[in-house]
């Protein structure tokens, strides 16, 4: 039960971070492209690579904390559903190129960020 509380608390924190970070990114870059969603997903992809690799190589992050961070915080921070919805809206609006770029950049950049997180964890 304690584990669920940690996941819920960090999940709520992740959701709040997503709300404020994506909002800030949209204020800076505008809404012509899903920049805010991309930004939080890139951050989350980097962090999951870092946390998971570091926790595999070290006992510094106990499983309870690892689950709270990855399932809770990063689950709240990142959003595949919003990515899907925004991409669908772009397709629906006829912005096929922007939708394609969103999918391509999101997948390639998130995988790259995860890899960078893993490499950083290995260097620590």
Curated annotation (Swiss-Prot):
Na(+) binds at residues 75, 78. Na(+) is not transported, but it plays an essential structural role and its presence is essential for fluoride channel function. The chain crosses the membrane at residues 5-25, 32-52, 67-87, 96-116. The keyword Cell inner membrane applies. GO terms for molecular function: fluoride channel activity; metal ion binding. The keyword Cytoplasm does not apply. It is found in: Cell inner membrane. GO terms for cellular component: plasma membrane. One of its GO terms (biological process) is cellular detoxification of fluoride. Keywords: Cell inner membrane, Cell membrane, Ion channel, Ion transport, Membrane, Metal-binding, Sodium, Transmembrane, Transmembrane helix, Transport. It is a multi-pass membrane protein. Fluoride-specific ion channel. Important for reducing fluoride concentration in the cell, thus reducing its toxicity. Belongs to the fluoride channel Fluc/FEX (TC 1.A.43) family. This is Fluoride-specific ion channel FluC. It comes from Geobacter sp. (strain M21).
């Amino acid at each position: 039960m304690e584990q669920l509380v940690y996941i819920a608390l960090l999940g709520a924190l992740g959701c709040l971070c997503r709300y404020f970070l994506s909002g800030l990114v949209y204020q800076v870059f505008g809404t012509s492209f899903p920049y805010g969603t991309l930004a939080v997903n890139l951050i989350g992809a980097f962090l999951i690579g870092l946390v998971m690799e570091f926790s595999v190589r070290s006992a510094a992050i106990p499983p309870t904390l690892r689950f709270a961070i990855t399932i809770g915080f990063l689950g709240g921070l990142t959003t595949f559903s919003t990515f899907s919805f925004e991409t669908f809206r772009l397709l629906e609006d006829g912005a096929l190129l922007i939708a394609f770029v969103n999918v391509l950049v999101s997948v390639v950049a998130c995988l790259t960020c995860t890899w960078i997180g893993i490499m950083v964890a290995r260097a620590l």
